[in-house]
A protein has these predicted regions:
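NAD(P)-binding Rossmann-fold cofactor-contacting core
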Residues: 20-35
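Conserved small/polar residues in nucleotide/adenosyl-binding loops
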Residues: 282-287
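Rossmann-like adenosine-cofactor binding region
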Residues: 36-104, 225-231
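ATP-dependent small-molecule kinase phosphotransfer cores
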Residues: 178-236
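A glycine- and Lys/Arg-enriched "phosphate-lid" helix/loop adjacent to the NTP-binding pocket
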Residues: 237-276
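Adenosine-phosphate binding glycine-rich loop
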Residues: 83-145
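Glycine-rich adenosine-cofactor-binding loop
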Residues: 1-17, 152-154
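Conserved lysine of the Walker
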Residues: 158
Length: 290
């Protein structure tokens, strides 16, 4: 087992690991002390560890996206756990999922467990089903805290469905295209005309990163948000992503959308983007069903 960090949480984690019979418990530090048997992050990659537990604040809100260990180079990993609970999935957890690690879990459930057992202590009574209580509270918190992001082709109904769904779920509605316009002071066609698609995508990624790390939101995303890999990573760190799948013949041509100015352009765009949309885990068959 590898434990990242050398603070108080490391000490607790190490004690539990040894108590549960871990064959080896190795400590990883940015400034390793060889006399204490500590490893650098570079050395840790070749440790042969089966389990990694992060006890550092790396990747914690608001400094999301930080990851010190390259888990993709550790093929024997069976589990990665991160004590950080905000965002729901740190960069470490996202990378572990991408690397196919069987178990990759953030720290929210641990936070809830601490609260449940602290409540038992202070109230001087035991819950009838502490484990079940932890699971129920964790699920309720996750439903409340996580974002819902809607993706799909231009004019697929993301804004319309998004506003209705935000009201239903009690989440704040955010239209990322509107936020781009608000921040830049120009319309989307004007941004395209002045800076091209690359310029627009950079602004889109900046607004995605800004809002995706927050919580309790319904995010209506631009149709091309899936063209930048970092956008999907940002959306997944703190939410569920839904694809609104509207039939091609029901989509609107033009309407101030620079990349869908003709039927042929729309068909070509749909052919290019559909495989990217379908890579996601959650799909809504149609805006009406959503």
């Amino acid at each position: 087992m590898l434990i990242l960090g050398t603070g108080g949480t490391h000490n607790t984690t190490s004690a539990v690991a040894r108590d549960k019979g871990a064959a080896r418990v190795l400590t990883v530090s940015r400034t390793p002390d060889a006399a204490k048997g500590q490893l650098s992050y570079e050395e840790a990659v070749f440790s042969g560890a089966q389990i990694v537990i992060n006890t550092t604040p790396a990747g914690m809100y608001p400094n999301v996206g930080v990851c010190s260990l390259d888990v993709a180079k550790m093929p024997g990993l069976e589990a990665v756990l991160d004590v950080v609970y905000n965002p729901d999935k740190t960069e470490l957890i996202l990378r572990a999922e991408e690397a196919g690690v069987p178990v990759a879990v953030g720290g929210l459930e641990m936070l809830v467990a601490q609260a449940v057992y602290a409540a038992e202590y202070f109230l001087s009574r035991k819950f009838d089903d502490a484990a079940g209580e932890i699971g129920r509270i964790t699920a309720a918190l996750r439903r409340d805290m996580l974002n819902v992001a809607l993706i799909g082709m231009p004019s697929s109904g993301k804004s319309t469905v998004g506003r209705a769904l935000a009201e239903k779920l009690g989440k704040k509605f955010i239209d990322l295209d509107e936020e781009i316009v608000k921040a830049d002071g120009r319309s989307i066609p004007d941004i395209f005309a002045a800076e091209g698609e690359d310029g627009f995508r950079a602004k889109e990624s900046a607004q995605t990163a800004r809002f995706a790390k927050e919580g309790r939101q319904l995010l209506s995303c631009g149709g091309g948000i899936i063209k930048q890999g970092e956008n999907l990573r940002a959306l997944h760190q703190n939410g569920v992503v839904l694809f609104l799948d509207r039939p091609l013949d029901a989509l609107t041509v033009g309407g101030g959308r620079p990349l869908s100015s003709s039927t042929e352009a729309l068909k070509k765009m749909e052919a290019e983007r559909r495989p990217l949309y379908l890579c996601l885990l959650y799909t809504s068959p149609s805006p009406r069903d959503a």
